[in-house]
Amino acid sequence: MKITKITSHVLGYDLPETLGYSQQYYKKRTSHIVEVETDEGVTGWGECFGPGNIAFANKGIVEKVIQPIVLGMQALDRDVIWHKVYNLMRDHGQKGMPLQALSGVDIALWDLAGKAANLPLYKMIGGAHRDKVEVYGYGMMLRPENIKSLISRFKEESAEIKEMGFKALKM
């Protein structure tokens, strides 16, 4: 099952307000989805981390750097592919955008392998270590506001998250 094409899809939408976290504020939410196609018609999907315009830079790395390296390779040779790409890109950085782009391709190859084997991924990586996973509520994004307003809003939002039944939250 050979890799025939890799396509990056950058999705985005404008937020109704400016939001932020410890590193930056942003007005648009983006997601970078990677699609790996094979000669047998099996397709795998992955996601690259990279907020904002970083998603477009990662798209270029996936399509212009990684794709030419892996076209024609066996899609099930995930480890071989990962090390080949990593070793060819490592002079350009062992973290950040090159690894974000590689991770999206790697996730897509795992998805593809699970589909080809007709197995869920947890079976392919050694089985289920638990039968449930606790989830957390998410919120309390930064906004351009004064600290007093921020504290008040965080108290309200955390109470709302707790009322929804979450036992933990991420901010």
Residue ranges and their predicted role:
Residues 1-45, 49-52:
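Structured beta-strand/loop patches that form or line metal/cofactor-binding pockets in enzymes
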Residues 18-21, 120, 155-156:
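Glycine-rich, charged/polar anion/phosphate-binding loops
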Residues 34, 45, 77, 116, ...:
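Ligand-binding pocket scaffold of soluble enzyme catalytic domains
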Residues 37-116:
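Metal- or metallocofactor-binding catalytic centers and their adjacent structured scaffolds
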Residues 106-146:
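Glycine-rich, aromatic-flanked loop segments that form ligand/cofactor-binding clefts
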Residues 131-171:
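Metal-dependent enolase-superfamily TIM-barrel catalytic cores that perform enediolate-based chemistry
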